Protein backbone atom coordinates (compact mmCIF):
# COMPACT_ATOMS: atom_id res chain seq x y z
CA UNK A 1 0.00 0.00 0.00
CA UNK A 2 1.07 3.55 -0.66
CA UNK A 3 2.01 5.79 2.22
CA UNK A 4 -0.26 8.69 3.01
CA UNK A 5 1.35 12.09 2.84
CA UNK A 6 1.30 13.55 6.32
CA UNK A 7 4.46 15.62 6.08
CA UNK A 8 4.32 19.22 5.01
CA UNK A 9 6.69 20.24 2.22
CA UNK A 10 9.53 22.46 3.36
CA UNK A 11 10.04 25.85 1.75
CA UNK A 12 12.60 25.91 -1.00
CA UNK A 13 15.94 27.32 0.12
CA UNK A 14 16.34 28.92 -3.30
CA UNK A 15 13.83 31.63 -2.35
CA UNK A 16 15.97 32.89 0.54
CA UNK A 17 18.37 35.82 0.29
CA UNK A 18 21.88 34.52 0.95
CA UNK A 19 25.53 35.45 0.30
CA UNK A 20 28.40 33.01 -0.31
CA UNK A 21 32.10 33.33 -1.08
CA UNK A 22 33.44 30.81 -3.59
CA UNK A 23 36.61 30.15 -5.54
CA UNK A 24 36.21 29.38 -9.24
CA UNK A 25 38.96 27.40 -10.94
CA UNK A 26 38.97 28.96 -14.40
CA UNK A 27 42.09 27.10 -15.50
CA UNK A 28 40.41 23.70 -15.79
CA UNK A 29 37.35 25.20 -17.49
CA UNK A 30 39.41 27.18 -20.04
CA UNK A 31 41.64 24.26 -21.05
CA UNK A 32 41.76 23.82 -24.86
CA UNK A 33 40.00 27.14 -25.53
CA UNK A 34 41.56 29.33 -28.23
CA UNK A 35 43.52 32.39 -27.14
CA UNK A 36 41.11 34.97 -28.52
CA UNK A 37 38.14 33.41 -26.73
CA UNK A 38 39.60 32.91 -23.25
CA UNK A 39 38.56 36.10 -21.41
CA UNK A 40 35.06 36.21 -22.96
CA UNK A 41 34.62 32.53 -22.09
CA UNK A 42 35.81 33.23 -18.51
CA UNK A 43 32.98 35.76 -18.12
CA UNK A 44 30.50 33.16 -19.40
CA UNK A 45 31.94 30.55 -17.02
CA UNK A 46 31.49 32.86 -14.02
CA UNK A 47 27.91 33.56 -15.11
CA UNK A 48 27.15 29.84 -15.52
CA UNK A 49 28.77 28.99 -12.16
CA UNK A 50 26.70 31.64 -10.36
CA UNK A 51 23.52 30.47 -12.07
CA UNK A 52 24.12 26.88 -10.96
CA UNK A 53 25.30 27.72 -7.44
CA UNK A 54 22.50 30.15 -6.58
CA UNK A 55 19.66 28.81 -8.72
CA UNK A 56 18.72 32.09 -10.44
CA UNK A 57 18.61 32.82 -14.16
CA UNK A 58 19.30 36.54 -13.71
CA UNK A 59 23.05 36.94 -12.99
CA UNK A 60 24.71 40.37 -12.81
CA UNK A 61 28.49 40.68 -12.92
CA UNK A 62 30.15 43.59 -11.13
CA UNK A 63 32.49 45.86 -13.11
CA UNK A 64 35.43 45.12 -10.76
CA UNK A 65 35.06 41.40 -11.45
CA UNK A 66 34.97 42.08 -15.19
CA UNK A 67 38.16 44.14 -14.91
CA UNK A 68 39.83 41.41 -12.84
CA UNK A 69 39.01 38.84 -15.53
CA UNK A 70 40.29 41.09 -18.33
CA UNK A 71 43.26 42.80 -16.61
CA UNK A 72 45.86 40.57 -18.33
CA UNK A 73 44.19 40.79 -21.71
CA UNK A 74 42.04 38.48 -23.79
CA UNK A 75 44.60 35.64 -23.81
CA UNK A 76 45.49 35.32 -20.12
CA UNK A 77 42.60 35.43 -17.65
CA UNK A 78 43.54 34.38 -14.08
CA UNK A 79 43.74 30.67 -13.23
CA UNK A 80 41.49 31.09 -10.20
CA UNK A 81 39.23 33.84 -8.95
CA UNK A 82 37.48 34.40 -5.62
CA UNK A 83 33.94 35.74 -5.91
CA UNK A 84 31.08 36.69 -3.60
CA UNK A 85 27.67 35.49 -4.80
CA UNK A 86 24.72 37.45 -3.39
CA UNK A 87 21.18 36.28 -4.08
CA UNK A 88 18.97 39.37 -3.82
CA UNK A 89 15.36 40.36 -4.29
CA UNK A 90 14.49 42.03 -7.59
CA UNK A 91 12.91 45.49 -7.08
CA UNK A 92 11.61 45.62 -10.66
CA UNK A 93 7.94 44.57 -10.52
CA UNK A 94 7.54 43.63 -14.19
CA UNK A 95 10.60 41.36 -14.18
CA UNK A 96 9.88 37.64 -14.64
CA UNK A 97 12.47 36.73 -11.96
CA UNK A 98 11.84 37.47 -8.29
CA UNK A 99 15.51 37.05 -7.38
CA UNK A 100 18.83 37.86 -9.04
CA UNK A 101 22.45 37.04 -8.27
CA UNK A 102 25.11 39.73 -7.97
CA UNK A 103 28.67 38.45 -8.48
CA UNK A 104 31.44 40.61 -7.02
CA UNK A 105 35.23 40.22 -6.94
CA UNK A 106 37.03 39.38 -3.69
CA UNK A 107 40.79 40.05 -3.89
CA UNK A 108 42.89 37.45 -2.03
CA UNK A 109 46.65 37.05 -1.72
CA UNK A 110 46.60 33.24 -1.91
CA UNK A 111 44.02 30.57 -2.69
CA UNK A 112 45.47 28.00 -0.29
CA UNK A 113 43.01 26.45 2.20
CA UNK A 114 40.05 28.58 1.07
CA UNK A 115 36.62 26.99 1.15
CA UNK A 116 33.12 28.04 0.18
CA UNK A 117 31.59 29.90 3.11
CA UNK A 118 28.36 31.67 3.88
CA UNK A 119 28.74 35.38 4.57
CA UNK A 120 26.48 37.45 6.79
CA UNK A 121 24.92 39.67 4.16
CA UNK A 122 25.00 43.43 4.54
CA UNK A 123 22.64 45.20 2.16
CA UNK A 124 24.40 48.00 0.25
From Swiss-Prot:
Superkingdom, taxonomy of origin: Eukaryota
GO terms of biological process kind: cytoplasmic translation
Keywords of the record: Ribonucleoprotein, Ribosomal protein
Family, as annotated: Belongs to the eukaryotic ribosomal protein eL31 family.
Gene Ontology annotations for the cellular component aspect, listed alphabetically: cytosolic large ribosomal subunit
Cystine pairs: none
Keyword Transferase attached: no
Coiled coil: none
Alphabetized CDD domains for the sequence: Ribosomal_L31e
GO MF terms, alphabetically ordered: structural constituent of ribosome
Name of this chain's protein: Large ribosomal subunit protein eL31
InterPro entries for this protein: Ribosomal_eL31, Ribosomal_eL31_CS, Ribosomal_eL31_dom_sf
Pfam families xref list: Ribosomal_L31e
Amino acid sequence: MAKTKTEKKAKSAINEVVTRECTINLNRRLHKVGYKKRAPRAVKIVRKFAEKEMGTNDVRIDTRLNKALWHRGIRNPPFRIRVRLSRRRNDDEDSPNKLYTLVTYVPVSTFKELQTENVESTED
